[in-house]
Amino acid sequence: MRRRDFVKTMSAAGASVLLPHRTLLAQTAQSLLPEPRVKRVMVMFKCHFDAGFVDTQYNVVHKRYFEKFFPEAIEVARAANAGGKRRYVWTTGSWLLFEYLDQASPADRKTMEDAIARGDIAWHALPFTWQTEMMSPSTIEGSLALSQLLDKRFDKATTGAKMTDVPGHTRGIIPPLAKHGVTFLEVGVNGGSTPAELPPLFLWKNPAGASLAVMYHHEYGGVAVVPGSDLALVTEVRGDNSGPHRPEEIEKIHANLTARFPNAEITAASLSEMANALAPYHDKLPVVTQEIGDTWIYGCASDPLKVARYREISRLRDEWIKRGTLQVGDETDVQLLRHVLLEPEHTWGTDTKTWLDFDNYIPSDLARMLDTKNYKVVEFSWIEKRQDLMDGVATLPPSLRGEAENAIRALIVPAEEEIAGRPIPHPPGKPIETTYFTLGIDPRTGAIMRLRNKAVGREWASEKNSIALFTYQTLSANDYARYQASYLTTKADWAAKDFGKPNIERFGAKREEWQSVNASVEVTRLKRSHIASVALHFDDEQAAQSGRVALPLSIVIDLILPDDKPIIYLNLTWRGKPATRMPEALWLTFNPISEDEKGWTLDKSGEWISPFDVVANGNRHMHAVQKGFAYESGGHRFEVETLDTPVVALDKRDPLVFSNDQPDVKKGFHSCLFNNCWGTNYIMWYGEDVRARYILHA
């Protein structure tokens, strides 16, 4: 996220004015050739919303937007439009406006209602910017209820949407948006990140024929002339949580647009007005059918508990919808989602480079800092994000709330496991015979090295093609230099700090991987299942004592094989992991025997997508999956449902990869249990016990 990036520009009077960089895209128009054929220019104004970052989420929302920015925007728009022309309309996501109207005093609410009636304040269809790969189709649908309720209240029809900062999204968002009348999505990419190779305006289609017009550009805002028309669309987006434009900025923007489009009428507009103006020209737009993906998705593996809770409640909500207990967009759903939707919002805490130092990385140094003011603020901002989900659960009717609380409680890792039955030590190399499978465990790594489906004789694993291979990985300054050289589009100081970990070389950071050197296996025969418990053992005490490595004290993989169906429940549990700021990643690799690389697909927000169908400069290396990933060929199918850990790397087991090479899927699918490799506002250390659950269909 490009932060505190300000540049000086000259106002119309020649005075020096300090403005956020994102407002300046239209202001560069004077350096461009005039475009006299354009007769209509529609301009959308907003600032980028981070639910946190510069401060805690509460302070950003209430102290900045509710107490300061909304009143300022109302007055700025009133003054700008006083002459009878629409020169300024301030747009916000639906969530901020919905919350403001719900919480404001009667007088402030009336002032806002009057501004909306005048057309001075507008909202778009989405609550805010998400990392959309973290969302189910029904969650996306449910989120639209906020804008639909505002539409009903103010007699509007919202058809336009915007997301800013996150470089790309999944094709799975198209059907739920199109289903509810959203026809236009504007995407402004973070200025330090490589944008996907896409036209500035295109029609994004999925295989079923659903479509969405998209405006895409490498800045928060942009300018696009609609093909085959006299229309230009402009989005003017101020910097992060920076509020409405100043009057002198508005004048400068209009002046520059007039210079670029001398024959055009320039009008401030909402995104829905822009969407409706663009609609007649959809058939003139280039068509894109590929996945784009999110090159920031590796950050979403930084808080395993938050993500596990969110995914559990999302699945439970889908079950309630299926049962008819809850309907998408009803009052119960809205009250739940107005909190839960903040979980996949793209801001996960406060700005690490502002609040933290670059000296206290190793576990012993970090432990000494955790009680200091800035570190406590950062940790609070992460806890605040987790609390959003709990606040949503608290709004549920008692019966649903009880279900949700029980589901969340079940995610707590107990200090010790309750042992069912009588575990019997089992030689790791010796096959384990169950009703449906012959199972073999690697005596060193503890991974599955044999998995034979007895009914069809299909062998899925071998010593070369193992399943559920655990790896602990550390990274180096060279890894960050390589990654930044391939991905960043700027050498600005903020980018190196956001996308790096300055000074880690001083603390001995190395790129290394650790796998178990000795696995012990116990098998328990229960009435209706077998349980194979695999304990992993590591041998590098020197690395741990140096602070370079923060391996858990205990890692156990439980394989539960029921007698009534050919599936395996796989639970990986770690306990006693030291918290560290040194870059680390924990992985579970699935690399079954496969013959046809084209047989692999990933479920992303409800659409099964080929890993080879991703646009250039999209994310071809890493995805967040909804249900899981699967291989199918020759009438046989191997599927991994990943209940808690959605982020999956393909080919290289590495969170810091940006490449246009197609992935070599024969090197495996690596489920990221946790990483702290990205800075910005993600979780930087994690010392809690973790359980990651999977279901294998073979």
Q: Where on the chain are the PLM-derived regions?
A:
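Small/flexible residues
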Residues: R4-D5, L24, R311, G508, ...
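Catalytic and substrate-binding regions of extracellular carbohydrate-active enzymes
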Residues: D330, V334, L342-W574, V690
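N-terminal export signals
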Residues: D5-A26
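Short amphipathic alpha-helical segments that mediate assembly, nucleic-acid/protein binding
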Residues: L25, I250, R401-A404
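Catalytic-domain carbohydrate-binding cleft regions of carbohydrate-active enzymes
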Residues: A12-A13, A29-D388, L526-A698
